[in-house]
Amino acid sequence: MSLLTEVETPIRNEWECRCNDSSDPLVVAASIIGILHLILWILDRLFFKCIYRLFKHGLKRGPSTEGVPKSMREEYRKEQQSAVDADDSHFVNIELE
């Protein structure tokens, strides 16, 4: 007698959902939380570069440009942009003295 005949194979009825009371508030809440988590995870993976660049560079104000000549401001902006674009997987921030 082979082992395959000894193993219990589930029938199709056992694979179907047994939760007839799906209107339970806990089940509904868990489903909503699970769906929201999945959506947020997908958005995070799709837009993580934009999101983290915004948090790292957009929310933090740089040094004041008041009284600085326009040419120096443009040079600083180009250096900051090239530092961010230097490595696609890691952000680099150069502090100018």
From Swiss-Prot:
Residues 60-85 are annotated as: Disordered. GO terms for molecular function: monoatomic ion channel activity; proton transmembrane transporter activity. Residues 1-22 are virion surface. It is a single-pass type III membrane protein. The chain crosses the membrane at residues 23-43. Residues 44-97 are intravirion. The record marks W41 as: Seems to be involved in pH gating. A lipid is attached at C50 (S-palmitoyl cysteine). The M2 protein from most influenza A strains is inhibited by amantadine and rimantadine, resulting in viral uncoating incapacity. Emergence of amantadine-resistant variants is usually rapid. Glycans are attached at N20. Residues 71-80 have a biased composition (Basic and acidic residues). It is found in: Virion membrane; Host apical cell membrane. The record marks H37 as: Essential for channel activity, possibly by being protonated during channel activation, and by forming the channel gate and the selective filter. GO terms for biological process: protein complex oligomerization; symbiont genome entry into host cell via pore formation in plasma membrane; symbiont-mediated suppression of host autophagy. The modification Phosphoserine is found at S64, S82. InterPro entries: Flu_M2 (IPR002089). Keywords: Disulfide bond, Glycoprotein, Host cell membrane, Host membrane, Host-virus interaction, Hydrogen ion transport, Inhibition of host autophagy by virus, Ion channel, Ion transport, Lipoprotein, Membrane, Palmitate, Phosphoprotein, Signal-anchor, Transmembrane, Transmembrane helix, Transport, Viral ion channel, Virion. Forms a proton-selective ion channel that is necessary for the efficient release of the viral genome during virus entry. After attaching to the cell surface, the virion enters the cell by endocytosis. Acidification of the endosome triggers M2 ion channel activity. When the channel is activated, one or more imidazole moieties of His-37 probably become bi-protonated. Belongs to the influenza viruses matrix protein M2 family. Cytoplasmic tail plays an important role in virion assembly and morphogenesis. This is Matrix protein 2. It comes from Influenza A virus (strain A/Hickox/1940 H1N1).
